[in-house]
Amino acid sequence: MRLIALSLACLLPLASLPATAADASVEARLTARGLKFSIDDDGDYKVVLNFSEEGRTQLVYVSGGTEDVSGLSIREVFAPAANIKTDGVTAAMALDLLRESRTKKIGAWEIAGDYLYYVIKLPDNVDAAQLNAAIRVAGSIADDKEIELSGDSDRL
């Protein structure tokens, strides 16, 4: 019984840590481009793009962690475009999104949980200007799709 209590006591502080830790290199690159951001509970960097001409905003996230793919460190930039359930994304639309992804030079549509995201996967060694460009591309494409699917709604 003491062993169980001791084990739980040792693990308890870990429960409050985010799933992925934020990365100081991302913070430095965002700051270098003058982008304001916050860090969410998962350790991802949340940027709100302002499309002033359209009077709209768009959420874009930069993952706080990376994934290793054959020795290449990959970081994701992702922007939500729709809620699958409330915005009525159908199976036929999903096939259209796959076809549309084929036409994009960088990034593709993905579904995670109940949301449709535009996701760009980059080598983590991109500089501040390149990361900023990816953020703007993902945000613009996602916002255009949000308008297409939900009309004037600007929830994401």
Language-model-derived ranges and their functions:
Residues 20-70:
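N-terminal secretory signal peptides
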Residues 1-7:
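Bacterial N-terminal signal peptides that target proteins for export
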Residues 73-115:
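Short, internal acidic amphipathic alpha-helical interface segments
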Residues 41-43, 51, 64-66, 78-81, ...:
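A mature extracytoplasmic/lumenal domain signature
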Residues 23, 27-30, 91-95, 128, ...:
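Extracytoplasmic/secreted envelope proteins and their assembly/folding machinery
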Residues 13-18:
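N-terminal signal peptide c-region/cleavage motif recognized by signal peptidases
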